[in-house]
Amino acid sequence: MRCNIKRLFTLAIGVFAATLVIISFSKDNYEREWKQGPQSNEARAVGHQSPDLFPVGQNSLPHQPIPPSLGEKDLSDPFNFLFSSNKITLRKLYDLTKNVDFDQLRQNECKKNITLSKFWEKSEQRNVPEDDNWERFYSNIGSCSVYSDDQMIDNLLHDLNTSPIKHVHIMDGGTQVKFVFTFKNDKQAVFKPMRFGRDYESDPNHFYFSDFERHHAEIATFHLDRVLGFRRAIPTVGRVLNMTTELFEKAEKKLKKTFFFSPAKNFCFVSRCDYYCDTTHAICGLPDMKEGSVQVFLPDESAVPRKHNRSPYRRTYSKKNQVAEWQSSMNYCTDKVKTKRQYAHGRRLLDLVDIHILDYLIGNQDRHHFESFNVFNDLPSYAIHLDHGRAFGRSDFDDDDIILPLRQCCILRPSTFQTLMNFYSTPKSLTKALHESLSKDPAHPILAYKHYPAMERRLAKIMSHILECFESRGVAEVLVAEYNNPDVSDAEQNDEEQSEEHQDKKDDKKTV
């Protein structure tokens, strides 16, 4: 009996020891896997990702820094990177386009350019007030671009940055934190607060539709749109606010209730929205200073109506079905876009390519709709460049799907080609011109310098794709002032546009 007990005791000790060894071995393997972290397909595809960017599978939220304009100035060289244009690509582009009459083509891109005030004065004998910079901006909205007078825009940006705030309320309909500022002159603007510093990169495990919005992306995109000569983005400027006197004391009641002091004694708010409006994602000052972007309101739609149209290159906005038809078929533009009446004639398809060139340069995957002014009667409307808060999220990854409209449709506005070619071929690069423009913003520096080589890299890819189109389709077919598909009648174009807009109002963006 005593012998059996001793044997059982020895056996139990052995089993216990073996169990400890197994547990220790598993834990060691688990920790090793956790430290390594999963690598995304996107990161692997680039091949030059810095090992410090994503050391684990999921990023932790960084501390909220002070506004860069209030901190120490970054004296490093923003252009301390190697980049040169592909000489073979440049030579081929020059040779293929040397006989193109760009002056004539550019004249036909927008045949009648008239401002809103001139149009109403002529068509309705109606005078448009110009008592402040908001009204001057509205009255000078044109039939070819949102603005054309740079000095007028600079004056408006100054007012957006300095005008006393009268009232602050939560902007309805936004997925993330946005406020509406009403200034002393009763004019309004949209405010997006700074959540992260300039260096923060999007988590590769986040979908484009759940990524955090970045206020500085709105500022930088406005300047890039201006540098590229589009002038179809909405004027946006950086502004540093005192959260106590300029936000809390001016806030509506339901917003004011969401303010609190953090354990670090910083003043914070949560606000109300669909995503990230909770204490975990609170936005805090240091201790109560906060930077954000201020974007002028477009004129009220009751006075200046706009069309709201779904992009044919809209992503799925689904976790389950992540690949849209246009992402899997290179014939998509020919079969499904050029055959639609609203894209088969006029400037609309060229606008679509322009906006995707802009999106590709800034890394914006979140382009689901676009708007256009519906006020100039028979004059063709253009796509307004709106909603760039999720741009500039990744400097290490180029989403080449964004540029598929150019590659599939193979058409391009002559002025766009000339602008891109100029930046690609001359010493004053695209990012140098952008940096010069951004340095005028009161909240500069606006972008982390690591985005500059990313933009130059993407520009080089765009030029390569343009060359491919020239060689496969011919320059005359690619560079066009207007697109016209002879196989599609334009008789019912307006009816189809109205039908599309009506459907879009019923079918808002969803994530599944």
Swiss-Prot record:
Residues 27-512 are lumenal. Glycans are attached at residues 113, 242. Mn(2+) binds at residues 213, 387. Residues 489-499 have a biased composition (Acidic residues). GO terms for molecular function: ATP binding; manganese ion binding; protein serine kinase activity; protein serine/threonine kinase activity. Its EC number is 2.7.11.1. It catalyses: L-seryl-[protein] + ATP = O-phospho-L-seryl-[protein] + ADP + H(+); L-threonyl-[protein] + ATP = O-phospho-L-threonyl-[protein] + ADP + H(+). The chain crosses the membrane at residues 7-26. Residues 1-6 are cytoplasmic. Its cofactor is Mn(2+). It is an enzyme of class 2 (transferase). The active site is at 366. ATP binds at residues 176, 192, 213, 295-298, 371, 387. One of its GO terms (cellular component) is extracellular region. Keywords: ATP-binding, Disulfide bond, Glycoprotein, Golgi apparatus, Kinase, Manganese, Membrane, Metal-binding, Nucleotide-binding, Secreted, Serine/threonine-protein kinase, Signal-anchor, Transferase, Transmembrane, Transmembrane helix. It is a single-pass type II membrane protein. InterPro entries: FAM20 (IPR024869), FAM20_C (IPR009581). Residues 486-512 are annotated as: Disordered. Belongs to the FAM20 family. This is Extracellular serine/threonine protein kinase CeFam20. The gene is famk-1.
